């Protein structure tokens, strides 16, 4: 493309993204491309099923970009994959689509994100079962857990696991027919095929897969469009009856998909349902340690731990924080990211993030001391009698659980102890309460007093 053509196309993409939902933009716009602009006509390569959407929703975008870049009224000529050399006659009404062109669409595209793999997925206690189940499905699709239903809040790695499964299956069998799609985009495709009267093609596309990966299936429950759930039900049955693997993700359990037909809910529970919860501190540190390799900055350990303490709800917040820091560091030409710099960079993000109630570590020490009959001074000191050691370790555990302080900061509040001592105490108590119900009850009692 010429320089002006590049500017023109980038402006179209920019305007389209600002006006459309992200999922709609990704589905209808991202795979289109500009072939040329000649004689005030823009030739755009497009999936034929998406032409109607462009004509109805993006005409003004193209006109605006045309006047901005070429100072001219730019009309559009859509070309399809097997027809790039010929022009398609435009019509604003009674639009006719070439069935021959639609039937000549290429083999299924997976739409997987190649950057997501099992190797770069950070495991922790909160996602261990989901990872194990995903690996089992990737190794023996259609036999172990079918369907696999992964649920959890946003930004916890569900999409990563879906793509990791698909990429692993294709690595093992490049000829496998794999499809990743959001429920929202499944609905979009359904609507398009209904309009074009090409439902047989939709059925052929989805019912002949080896692996179907559906993200955010709860979106299907929100739609009342007649026939959408019916079509997915039939697709599910066709795949399952042929021992083809289905993996679904959701922000809630199958039983809480209230607007979904009961027969679908029942089928979602045929296989295995696994949950992903927010990452614990160690996992957040591991995620950050992995992510910072993408940046050309030095992150001291105390900065990493500080950031891990600031965002405890999902991975996206951590990734967003690193982008904020990168922006500030590049602007200030800083190579080493200190805690102060990190705090400055994420200030705005923290204002939009649910904040943990500020609890002084001294308050935790006081309540733990009262419960176990020891003083705060003894908790901070080095005396190692059994009851004092237990109180000290419980207080460190609660300081980690109930505050966003870094390990070094907590250690400083406990007589200047090293961060490794705090981590040891935290892990010890965390493991003990799994086996010791009485200790778990004691800690819950103390937590209630602190709150």
From Swiss-Prot:
UniProt KW Hydrolase keyword: no
A single cellular component GO annotation: cytoplasm
Region (Domain II), start-end ranges: 101-110
Gene Ontology terms: biological process: DNA replication initiation; regulation of DNA replication
An example Gene Ontology molecular-function term: ATP binding
Annotated localization: Cytoplasm
Gene3D superfamilies: 1.10.1750.10, 1.10.8.60, P-loop containing nucleotide triphosphate hydrolases
Stretches the record annotates as Domain III, AAA+ region: 111-329
Superkingdom of source: Bacteria
Comment on protein domains: Domain I is involved in oligomerization and binding regulators, domain II is flexibile and of varying length in different bacteria, domain III forms the AAA+ region, while domain IV binds dsDNA.
Alphabetical list of HAMAP family matching this protein: DnaA_bact (MF_00377)
Protein name as annotated: Chromosomal replication initiator protein DnaA
Organism field: Streptococcus uberis (strain ATCC BAA-854 / 0140J)
Gene: dnaA
């Amino acid at each position: 493309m010429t320089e002006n053509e590049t500017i023109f196309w980038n402006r179209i993409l920019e305007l389209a993204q600002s006006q459309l939902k992200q999922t709609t933009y990704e589905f209808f716009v991202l795979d289109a491309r500009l072939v040329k602009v000649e004689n005030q006509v823009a030739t755009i390569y497009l999936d034929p099923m998406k032409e109607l959407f462009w004509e109805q929703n993006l005409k003004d975008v193209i006109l605006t970009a045309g006047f901005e870049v070429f100072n001219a009224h730019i009309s559009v000529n859509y070309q399809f994959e097997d027809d790039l050399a010929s022009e398609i006659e435009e019509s604003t009404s009674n639009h006719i689509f070439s069935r021959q062109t639609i039937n000549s669409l290429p083999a299924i595209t997976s739409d997987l994100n190649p950057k997501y793999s099992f190797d770069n997925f950070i495991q922790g206690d909160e996602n261990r079962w989901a990872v194990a189940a995903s690996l089992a499905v990737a190794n023996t699709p259609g036999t172990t857990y079918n369907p696999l239903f992964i649920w959890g809040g946003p930004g916890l790695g569900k999409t990563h696991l879906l793509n990791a499964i698909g990429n692993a299956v294709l690595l093992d069998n490049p000829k496998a027919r794999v499809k990743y799609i959001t429920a929202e985009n499944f609905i979009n495709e359904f609507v398009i095929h209904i309009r074009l009267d090409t439902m047989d093609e939709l059925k052929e596309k989805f019912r002949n897969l080896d692996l179907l990966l559906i993200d955010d299936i709860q979106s299907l429950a929100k739609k009342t469009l007649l026939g959408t759930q019916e079509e997915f039900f039939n697709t599910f049955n066709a795949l399952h009856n042929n021992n083809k693997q289905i993996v679904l993700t959701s922000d809630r359990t199958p039983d809480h998909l209230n607007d979904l037909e009961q027969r679908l809910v029942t089928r979602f529970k045929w296989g295995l349902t696994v949950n992903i919860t927010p990452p614990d501190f160690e996992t957040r540190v591991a995620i950050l340690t992995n992510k910072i390799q993408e940046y050309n900055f030095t992150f001291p350990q105390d900065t990493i731990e500080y950031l891990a303490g600031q965002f405890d709800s999902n991975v996206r917040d951590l990734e967003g924080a690193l982008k904020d820091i990168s922006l500030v560091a590049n602007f200030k030409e800083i190579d080493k990211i200190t805690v102060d710099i990190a705090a400055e960079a994420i200030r705005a993000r923290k204002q939009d993030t649910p904040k943990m109630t500020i609890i002084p570590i001294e308050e935790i020490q006081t309540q733990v001391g009262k419960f176990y009959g020891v003083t705060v001074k003894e908790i901070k000191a080095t005396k190692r009698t059994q009851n004092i050691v237990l109180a000290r370790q419980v207080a460190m555990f609660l300081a980690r659980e109930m505050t966003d302080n870094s390990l070094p900061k907590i250690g400083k509040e406990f007589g200047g102890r090293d961060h490794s001592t705090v981590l040891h105490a935290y892990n010890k108590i965390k493991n003990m309460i799994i086996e010791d119900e009485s200790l778990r009850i004691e800690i819950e009692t103390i937590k209630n007093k602190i709150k």
